[in-house]
From Swiss-Prot:
Keywords: Mitochondrion, Transit peptide, Ubl conjugation pathway. This is CUE domain-containing protein 4, mitochondrial. GO terms for cellular component: Hrd1p ubiquitin ligase complex; mitochondrion. One of its GO terms (molecular function) is ubiquitin binding. InterPro entries: CUE (IPR003892).
Length: 215
């Protein structure tokens, strides 16, 4: 065989080997990615903003962060998640294989029993009809203590609430968080105060409605 033919065969063989290796690598990578997605389902989970979880947690400190994150995945809205929490029912925990537990671990008191039984904290009563008023009363006391903690008593008047709502809309209309740490902390503080006041107003309306139903 002539040198030219040998060189041509070597080039063809090299190209063939490289092509086969590339095809094998692509197929293998696709299989790994597909199996990872199908086995865990983690890649299909909607993203959750940890800052939103923190905001809800400040209003309802007894709720599990993973349960808050799981509800935010479904509602995609902080106010909607707060409404769900105000109903007096415990927010459900995510599935066992959820990636949310890596970011928001269960508290030490929750344990594995929270998964199987989805138990309610001792201060939440949700088992019968009378539990609605009990849960509302407890939540109202909790909001009252939060208002005292953050010195928000002076902002409970109707005029202050209206101005607070206006400020709340201005804050939420910001599409991006401030760049400096100080501005972010101030923004979170305002959001926290506005959420506590809004939650208190909703809870007062709920308690008033329950009293009217009893009468």
């Amino acid at each position: 065989m002539q040198p030219e033919q040998l060189a041509g065969c070597a080039v063809v063989l090299t190209v063939t080997v490289l092509t086969l290796r590339w095809m094998f690598r692509v197929d293998k990578g696709g299989e790994v990615s597909e199996s990872r997605t199908s086995s865990s389902g983690v890649d299909n989970e909607p993203p959750v903003n940890s800052e939103h979880v923190h905001l809800v947690k400040t209003v309802f400190p007894h709720l599990e962060s993973s349960a808050i994150a799981y509800d935010l995945q479904k509602t995609k809205n902080v106010d909607a998640t707060i409404e769900n929490a105000l109903r007096g029912q415990p927010l459900p925990l995510p599935p066992r294989n959820s990636s949310l537990y890596a970011r928001f671990p269960l508290s030490a008191g929750a344990g594995a029993s929270s998964h199987s039984e989805e138990t309610t904290p001792s201060h939440e009563v949700t088992s019968n009809v009378s539990s609605g008023s009990s849960a509302s009363s407890l939540a109202s006391n909790e909001h009252r203590s939060l208002i005292e903690t953050y010195n928000l008593s002076s902002r409970i008047s109707s005029s202050d609430n209206s101005s607070s709502s206006t400020g709340n809309e201005e804050v939420r209309n910001r599409s991006k968080l401030p760049s400096s740490k100080k501005e972010r902390e101030e923004l979170f503080r305002k959001r926290k105060e506005e959420m506590i006041l809004a939650a208190r107003k909703r809870m007062e309306g709920k308690i008033k409605g329950e009293k009217q139903d009893k009468n």
